[in-house]
Amino acid sequence: MRLTDRRRPATDYRCRVPETSASDLVRSLLLTVPDFPQPGILFRDLTPVLADGAGLRAVVDNLVAAGGPVDAVAGVEARGFLLAAAAAYASGVGTLAVRKAGKLPGEVLRETYALEYGEAAIELHPGQLAPGSRVLLLDDVLATGGTLEAAARLLERAGYEVAGIGVVLELADLGGRARLAGHDVHAILSL
């Protein structure tokens, strides 16, 4: 018998997404950590969602479906990178990295945004796509909306159309959605 005759049937390693909504799956996997990173803060940890094959697939499928046809997917550093890469792969398009200031070499576009005590900046390489390209912007959490607002402005300054903004979790009481008025915002789960 030749070696090729003894092949085992291929194993299907694809995740089996349960017949449940993406929001129910995220809710079931989400960890709530009290007093992190400081006393009085209730931290919502999405890492168990991303670590679970069915959870990750449900999140990516949901965000891709909500985004419609796009030319690329942009992710905000850091967990937005994970979502954007997976969504871009699932959509058959490329991905753009919206980085913290000082992390990209060469020419960059920069947007600053206010923090509670100071300001921060994010950057993007210009000219990665044709002008007018439709880009889906993803991040893990929508809180105050400052980072996503700056990221959307950055993409628009680069000459791209923000086709939509998608997040896994929206912390609705922090009012971030209002800062993103004029954009189609999709949250899988809103608390």
UniProtKB/Swiss-Prot annotation:
Reactions catalysed: AMP + diphosphate = 5-phospho-alpha-D-ribose 1-diphosphate + adenine
GO aspect biological process, one term: purine ribonucleoside salvage
Keywords assigned: Cytoplasm, Glycosyltransferase, Purine salvage, Transferase
Pathway info: Purine metabolism; AMP biosynthesis via salvage pathway; AMP from adenine: step 1/1
CDD domains according to UniProt: PRTases_typeI (cd06223)
A Pfam match: Pribosyltran
InterPro entries with a match to the protein in the record: Ade_phspho_trans, PRibTrfase_dom, PRTase-like, UPRTase/APRTase
Gene Ontology CC annotations of this record: cytoplasm
A single MF term (Gene Ontology): adenine binding
Top-level EC class as recorded in UniProt: transferase
Gene3D superfamilies attached to this UniProt entry: 3.40.50.2020
Subcellular location per the Swiss-Prot or TrEMBL entry: Cytoplasm
EC number: 2.4.2.7
Protein family per UniProt: Belongs to the purine/pyrimidine phosphoribosyltransferase family.
Record function comment: Catalyzes a salvage reaction resulting in the formation of AMP, that is energically less costly than de novo synthesis.
Subunit description: Homodimer.
Protein name, UniProt field: Adenine phosphoribosyltransferase
